[in-house]
Design a protein with these regions (language model features):
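Active-site pocket-lining/capping segments in soluble small-molecule metabolic enzymes
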Residues: 1-150, 155-299
Length: 299
């Protein structure tokens, strides 16, 4: 019997290049330190000042050539996060974003684009058919009927649902296997489960990437002032943990899982890599290889 594997889509293709430059050699050399039921499906992100960018504001000192070379060296798909929801026709000719797509379209491993705007979907299909497309969670598809329609769209290889549908198994189980294969669940969202401002939050990022002057979105959710905490995310009703994946999602025919974190610090992203990919008995060894030595002072 074939064992179904989980594929993790990891944040910070550009933003956490330095972390992955150290982590990926460990993942290859010491594969026995990591769960054998999972693989790295992709790295996703975007450089700073991308007109088509969305979700989070990108930042990076590294070029597309550098990040692509790293991903290709390890046979990992690279995804551009171009999920701006407010694009207009005149934005489609942006030289920087087109140059990035042209570079990503040439990879030996097929690369992709995470997208929100249908205008951009049509443009990418016409001009860069080599790239696969991922429907972004920034669409905030909270109704199952919306999600079902989205997974039926042939232009998308994957669809990231709103995290509040993560546990809607009575409905998710009704999907045929080809649509189940498209679902890419956001595992570690810390956003308040009852949030009604999520779409406005994403639109604010889209406006800023377009260069529009607008006040920064201020989250008013309970506990927002403390920011992202992984322990808090684990208490979220939509959280998907390691045991959930192994015991619930994989047996049900779901295999794609997204880890958020582009706007966080690299230390926290490393904790995600340790929790989701690394066997508990080897997590300390990974820390020691990456940063932990006998002279490190925290205080």
């Amino acid at each position: 019997m074939e064992i179904r594997k989980a594929y993790f889509h990891l944040p910070g293709l550009f933003e956490f290049y330095e972390l992955y430059r150290v982590f990926l050699p460990l993942y290859r050399t010491h594969r026995d330190w990591f769960y054998d039921w999972c693989e790295i499906g992709s790295l996703y992100g975007a450089p700073a000042d991308c007109l088509w960018g969305g979700g989070r504001t990108g930042c990076s000192r590294h070029t597309a050539r550098e990040v692509l070379a790293l991903a290709q060296e390890y046979g990992i798909s690279a995804r551009l996060t171009f999920s701006n929801s407010l694009l207009r026709e005149e934005h489609l000719t942006d030289p920087k974003c087109n140059a990035l797509c042209a570079q990503f379209a040439q990879g030996s491993v097929q690369n992709g684009v995470i997208v929100h705007s249908d205008l951009l979907v049509d443009y990418l299909q016409t001009h860069y058919p080599e790239l696969y497309l991922v429907s972004s969670t920034t669409k905030v598809l909270t109704e199952f009927a919306q999600l079902e329609t989205e997974t039926a769209r042939p232009e998308f290889r994957y669809v990231v649902p709103d995290f509040r549908l993560n546990k809607a198994f009575a409905q998710l189980d009704s999907l045929p296997q080809p649509q189940k294969d498209k679902l890419e669940f956001l595992c570690n969202e810390c956003c308040w489960f009852g949030c009604t401002d999520r779409r406005r939050c994403y639109e604010n990022v889209s406006r800023r990437n377009l260069g529009e002057l607008c006040p920064e979105h201020r989250c008013t959710a309970p506990g927002a002032a403390e920011g992202y905490r992984f322990s808090k995310a684990m208490r979220n009703p939509g959280f998907i943990g390691v045991e959930d994946i192994r015991s619930t999602y994989l047996p049900r025919g779901f295999s794609q899982f997204k880890i958020e974190g582009r706007g966080l610090g690299s230390a926290l992203v490393l904790e995600f890599l340790l929790y989701y990919l690394t066997k508990p008995e080897h997590q300390l060894q990974v820390r020691e290889e990456i940063y932990l030595d006998n002279m490190l002072d925290l205080f």
